[in-house]
Amino acid sequence: MSKYNFFKKILRDNYKGEIIEGDKKYKIFNEVKKLNFLCTKKRNLVLIFCHNEMQSIISYLWALANNNIAILVNSNLDYNLAENLIKKYSPDIIITKYSNKFKNYNVEVEINKFFYLKKISSGKNKFFKDLALLLPTSGSTGSPKFVRISYKNLYYNTKDIVNYLHIKPFDITITTLPFSYTYGMSIINSHIFVPSKIIAYNGTVIERRFFELIKKWKVNSFGGVPLIFEMLKRLKLENFDLSSLKYITQAGGPLSKQLIKFFHNSFKKKKIKFITMYGSTEATSRMSYLPEKFNQTKTTSIGKGLQKSFKINDLNTGKEINENNKLGELVYFGKNVCLGYSLNSKDLSLKDQNKGILKTGDIGYKDEDGFFYVTGRLDRYVKIYDQRMNMDDIEKILLLKFSNICVKYKNKK
């Protein structure tokens, strides 16, 4: 078993972590133990259709605690796309809420409306010794391209997040994002690491039930992507009891300057920290944070690296730029940088191809105080009359004048 596998402590009977669903608390140790009948002498490849429900999260924790490799996919993945993934990766175990009859798999058992399927004929797999997870690169499109994450990646990224956010054993979080999505997964992992408590909530943030659970269980934190905060802005937050919340994190894409300031001011009145973060699946989730005290003065900054490991490379030469405020590609260094990608089961034996270096594909710069900014994407550049122009910049300029933008093109010109 990997020395970096912090999930294995779940198997100890003194593990204190809990999952809350509805009005009940469940000890994670007890629930994971119920799945030990799935254990074999070899490491298994486990495909999990992820739901923000207790049994689904427990299945994920069981897989990693027992040194298996988990493939996490969205629960709403189309059946035909799922069949294609199964052909490409040939998992030993499938965990799904839907008893679809996948070829060459038998239903072993049903627990809490989740079906555990085992492959009829399972051969010997070759896995890289520290491989832990396969995370999708494209949401629910069913692409066979996955990011290969190691137990070492998970350990260092989770430890950094726990240390920065000061997560304690008495803290309680609530799920707001699919855990097949790296940001949602990292919130679960950080509270398993401590360990503390997780509320398995499968609804949206605009439902009354969400706020009832926050009040009932005295939730301390939750995370959101831009869409979640756009929805929250429509609500009158002053009408809800959020007194137990200590902080709220935002990642998964840039939030507008106006929204950052709006939520910073709204939450500040309630003594809640609003922390913006930057990350990617290839970095096992989060790479940087903006300290809350800079929300007003460096609003659009992604902040500083969790491991202080960013640099800016020249777009033409690839060499490091030491000047401030000069655009280049943002490059990240860290022990949380993924192993590489996979397209099929053969790739699961590959070793670390990235060696701790991630070229993000983001265009940005560093200011005189060492804070980093992202202005666009490398693949969002076009050349017009030999001039490189960033479509993100063009879009921002147009949005200053127009509320909506439509582009009409003919013959792909």
Q: Model-predicted segments: where are they?
A:
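Conserved AMP-binding A3 loop
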Residues: 24-25, 132-159
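Conserved AMP-binding/adenylate-forming
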Residues: 34-77, 176-178, 388
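Gly/Ser/Thr-rich phosphate-binding loop
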Residues: 219-224, 233-297
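Conserved pre-ATP/AMP-binding loop-to-beta segment of ANL
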Residues: 11-12, 115-136, 143, 166-172
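Conserved ATP/PPi-binding loop(s) of AMP-dependent carboxylate-activating enzymes
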Residues: 304-307, 319-351, 389
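AMP-binding/adenylate-forming catalytic core of the ANL superfamily
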Residues: 48, 334, 339-340, 361-413
